[in-house]
Amino acid sequence: MISQSTLFLFILLIIGLIAKNQSLTVAIGVLFLLKFTFLGDKVFPYLQTKGINLGVTVITIAVLVPIATGEIGFKQLGEAAKSYYAWIALASGVAVALLAKGGVQLLTTDPHITTALVFGTIIAVALFNGVAVGPLIGAGIAYAVMSIIQMFK
């Protein structure tokens, strides 16, 4: 008999293939590989607790590559500082990092929220070609909204 988790992943795989979403398809493929080689029992807990940090590290490395290659240097930084778009980007970066901080706090204190956030991310990735950074930022937005609601209670 097929387990509920296998069926769920299979449905998500079909959605990923139909939506032509490579990230979702590869992620599910890796999860199936781990699950069916029985490595999942050892690897899944690690991925569940450290996966977000691992992903953020990989994204950070990718973002810093142009600095490492010399493509972006102090000259480009100075030129960017003259652009109001750069200042908007800077403020956005600060806002997103602060939202993500609240998201980590929310996911730690209220883990059942994770289910709704994961579903929202899956919908965005599969149907709208979104990028799967949604749970952390989504949790941050949820945390901010919940904090505002608490202020008015």
From Swiss-Prot:
It comes from the Bacteria. It is a multi-pass membrane protein. It is found in: Cell membrane. This is UPF0756 membrane protein BC_4596. Belongs to the UPF0756 family. PANTHER family: UPF0756 MEMBRANE PROTEIN YEAL. The chain crosses the membrane at residues 8-28, 54-74, 87-107, 117-137. Its main location: membrane. Keywords: Cell membrane, Membrane, Transmembrane, Transmembrane helix. It comes from Bacillus cereus (strain ATCC 14579 / DSM 31 / CCUG 7414 / JCM 2152 / NBRC 15305 / NCIMB 9373 / NCTC 2599 / NRRL B-3711). Pfam families: DUF441. InterPro entries: UPF0756_TM. GO terms for cellular component: plasma membrane.
